[in-house]
Amino acid sequence: MKNPMLEVVSLLLEKLLLISNFTLFSSGAAGEDKGRNSFYETSSFHRGDVLEVPRTHLTHYGIYLGDNRVAHMMPDILLALTDDMGRTQKVVSNKRLILGVIVKVASIRVDTVEDFAYGANILVNHLDESLQKKALLNEEVARRAEKLLGFTPYSLLWNNCEHFVTYCRYGTPISPQSDKFCETVKIIIRDQRSVLASAVLGLASIVCTGLVSYTTLPAIFIPFFLWMAG
């Protein structure tokens, strides 16, 4: 049986991560034309390579399949609204992506290198060095990616593009980006100033709205749980 408290914490963490990276998604709209007009030299890419595209706050990952094709996980609201492949196979816009993150629907899809990178620089197999893990054979990596093509549930914390490529490349789905974000949240929670600030805000809400259950209980329990977590 799932722990309701853990589910609430998980949901809050995902929403915080989405908000903190909203500028990443929205800033991409200005670079869409640039990405489509960019040309990438793919002769040095090998089938099964991990392609890494650093962004402002997050890094996007994919598996190179050869012939200028990249398999990558993309949230997309259209997947929940239509089965029309002609519409869902078009390049995912930022609005589709953001709404897809919110409703947690995605697909592992194949796009051109240009559509995958959108004008950004591409790093190749950088994870091998940063994670210091032994990679599977490139052909095995590519085959794993191809087997996973299609619809998949999405989670910023537990099932994102980094989980996809690390599973294909190393056999284990991990996401250092998500882990780093969770650690940052833990540090904030453990900071006694956060407890004090939440207590002050809680008291202020009681003063402004009166002693009613929907303000009194959060004002008491939120500082208490933050204090206990610290």
Curated annotation (Swiss-Prot):
One of its GO terms (cellular component) is rough endoplasmic reticulum. Inhibited by all-trans-retinyl alpha-bromoacetate and N-boc-L-biocytinyl-11-aminoundecane chloro-methyl ketone (BACMK). GO terms for molecular function: acyltransferase activity; O-palmitoyltransferase activity; phosphatidylcholine-retinol O-acyltransferase activity; retinoic acid binding; retinol binding. Its EC number is 2.3.1.135. GO terms for biological process: cellular response to leukemia inhibitory factor; lipid storage; positive regulation of lipid transport; response to bacterium; response to retinoic acid; response to vitamin A; retinoid metabolic process; retinol metabolic process. Coiled coil: none annotated. Transfers the acyl group from the sn-1 position of phosphatidylcholine to all-trans retinol, producing all-trans retinyl esters. Retinyl esters are storage forms of vitamin A. LRAT plays a critical role in vision. It provides the all-trans retinyl ester substrates for the isomerohydrolase which processes the esters into 11-cis-retinol in the retinal pigment epithelium; due to a membrane-associated alcohol dehydrogenase, 11 cis-retinol is oxidized and converted into 11-cis-retinaldehyde which is the chromophore for rhodopsin and the cone photopigments. Belongs to the H-rev107 family. This is Lecithin retinol acyltransferase. It comes from Homo sapiens.
